[in-house]
Every structure is written in C-alpha cells, then in structure tokens.
Curated annotation (Swiss-Prot):
Transmembrane segments: none
Organism: Lithobates berlandieri (Rio Grande leopard frog)
Domain of life (superkingdom): Eukaryota
A Pfam match: Antimicrobial_1
Tissue: Expressed by the skin glands.
Disulfide-bonded cysteines: 18-24
Protein name: Brevinin-1Be
Compartments it resides in: Secreted
Length: 24
C-alpha cells in the first residue's frame, strides 16, 4: 500500500460511514 492510498482511505471512510448511517 502507498501512504497516499492509506491517507485517502482514512479521509473517505468516515465520510462514507457518515452518509450510510445518516449521522452527518
């Protein structure tokens, strides 16, 4: 894994979970 990919995943996963759980 590249650090950039890990960083992007760390940024996007909370947003995706936020949208799915609708707790934004």
């Amino acid at each position: 894994f590249l650090p950039a990919i890990v960083g992007a995943a760390a940024k996007f996963l909370p947003k995706i979970f936020c949208v799915i759980s609708k707790k934004c």
